[in-house]
Amino acid sequence: VFVTIKPFYGPYVPDSIKNNLKTILRKYSVAGIVTEIQDLKYLYVEVDVNAYYNPSLAPDSAALKTVVTNNINSFADSAEMNKYGAKFKYSKFQTIVDNSSSAITSNITKVTIRRDMKPLLNQAAEYELCFGNPFYIKNTNGYNIQSSGFTIFGQPDTLYLGDKPAADKKTGSLFFFRLESRNNPVVVSGNVGTIDYARAEMLLKPITFTGTSKK
């Protein structure tokens, strides 16, 4: 039996608490049933909002920005967006922005989705990331997905994850690259996994991570 728990504070339940819960549940479990407590897989939605407004109706742009930001934050903190199986509805989000003030005439919002992966350090493992929303291929030459930095066994440099679409533009391959400069990526390891753009799924072959960074 697999169990997930959404804590009030922080995204994950500490391992010590997981072990205590498993010990308690073991007293009530039926013979042959083993309880495994897994970390939740959060899907983060990041938005870049450009709202257009009539300045004669809202002379104070800073105040208008504050109202829009507060409404977005309230929506982000709502139970609707923080329950199991929640769905982000783009049209509803745009309506929330537009309805923030009668001065707003329209908005163009760019949406980026993100998952935070907790790798097993210093041990080889496969990884699967599922996003539930088709990936947009902006560049057929690759580098459509982005990751923060990480290190792997046998490579001293900080690496990043990149993608290369296949000819069908439905699937592709994953690779690791390092940055010699901001706009100068160098591929270090090719074909380290696969990506399905339509299904929004990525599968990494067995890899040994040795560290991660937030940049």
Language-model regions: role of each:
Residues 1, 43-47, 107, 125, ...:
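Residues at beta-strand starts and edge strands
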Residues 1-80, 84:
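Carbohydrate-recognition loop of C-type lectin domains
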Residues 6, 169-174, 178, 182-215:
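Surface-exposed interaction regions enriched in Ser/Thr/Asp/Glu
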Residues 16, 143-145, 209-215:
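Extended Gly/Ser/Thr-rich low-complexity repeat segments
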Residues 18-28, 95-97, 172-180:
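Short amphipathic alpha-helix segments
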Residues 38, 62-155:
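An aromatic-glycine-centered, glycine-rich loop/turn in mixed alpha/beta architecture
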Residues 143-186:
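Structural flexibility/helix-modulation signal
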